[in-house]
Design a protein with these regions (language model features):
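Active-site-proximal, substrate-binding regions of enzyme catalytic domains
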Residues: 2-254, 264-290
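Conserved residues at the C-terminal ends of beta-strands
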Residues: 261
Length: 290
């Protein structure tokens, strides 16, 4: 039986919060777990509590190091895809990082194989994790980023659709359809600005790359905020949490599932799987560059 690779939300890395993870570890040897790069950024963001957070978060998995994998960060995927026009979606696991993590897990379990790896994470001598945390947890920048997507979507949608969203007259299926119709058009603007020929842009999107998944995810989130209202007055940290959650969701669409305690993340995951099960364009091959 092939292995199942399940993405774990960082909030499920504590034993008292994750009975389903404990059950899988003890009874389902073909179930493996994937930690996205963002999980380590979350674990290391607070320098004063870094060791305690790392040990506490990794203790649950420490007895099963050979069933744990690491997934590439989304920003690295986007850079690679835009440079090569090749999808990263089927090449997310990182062998070198996986081996480092497994040594670290053995150390957390009481061994000494990865002591130097753990110490390097804790001390962060080159400020690698501190720099990443500053980038990912820039709350104001994150709110501005999502606000830009919301503004673009408002301009693209008919006023009647916006009214239906605000009045909560559209169900989840209808919201997903809006994303399906709009994402390729918005992504086309990026390709056009980079001078990508239409045929290459079409072929690239057919591969369901990470950047298409990002556009789907951001539009789903934008629609949720348009419908709920209150974005302008929302605390920037709330938006950061939304975007961090969606990193887990997007990553999980490349594997076999997601374990999280957040229903809205499960809903977003199911919406993305729905979108990815369909052709990349609503029609056979529209002229996306016009």
């Amino acid at each position: 039986m092939p292995n199942r690779l399940i993405v774990l939300d960082q909030n499920k890395l504590r034993e008292d919060r994750a009975p389903e993870v404990v059950h899988a570890l003890q009874n389902e040897p073909n179930t493996h777990f994937v930690l996205p790069d963002i999980a380590f950024i979350e674990m290391t963001k607070n320098a004063d509590h870094r060791e305690r957070t790392l040990r506490g978060s990794l203790r649950l998995l420490a007895q099963y190091p050979n069933r744990v994998h690491v997934a590439k960060g989304l920003q690295d995927c986007f850079k690679s895809e835009l440079f090569t026009l090749e999808s990263s979606a089927n090449r997310l696991t990182l062998r070198e990082h996986r081996d480092n993590l497994r040594r670290l897990l053995r150390t957390v379990a009481g061994g000494d194989e990865g002591v130097s790896d753990l110490q390097r994470l804790i001390e962060d001598p080159d400020n690698h994790y501190s720099t990443l945390a500053d980038q990912y947890f820039d709350d104001l920048a994150n709110k501005n980023r999502l606000g830009g997507v919301i503004d673009a979507l408002k301009k693209a949608l008919p006023e009647s659709t916006l009214k239906d969203l605000r009045a909560k007259r559209l169900n989840r299926t209808e919201r997903v359809e809006i994303v399906y119709q709009r994402a390729p058009r918005l992504l086309a603007g990026l390709f056009k600005g980079r001078g990508v020929p239409e045929g290459k842009a079409w072929s690239f999107q057919k591969k369901k790359p990470m950047i298409l998944r990002e556009y789907y995810s951001m539009l789903l989130l934008a629609i949720d905020w348009i419908s709920a209202g209150g974005f302008e007055n929302a605390a920037p940290k709330t938006i950061t949490n939304d975007l961090i959650d969606h990193e887990y969701v997007i990553t999980a669409t490349c594997f076999d599932g997601l374990i999280t305690g957040e229903k809205r993340m499960i809903d977003a995951y199911n919406d993305l799987r729905n979108l990815l099960s369909r052709p990349s364009y609503p029609t056979a091959k529209p002229n996306i560059m016009n």
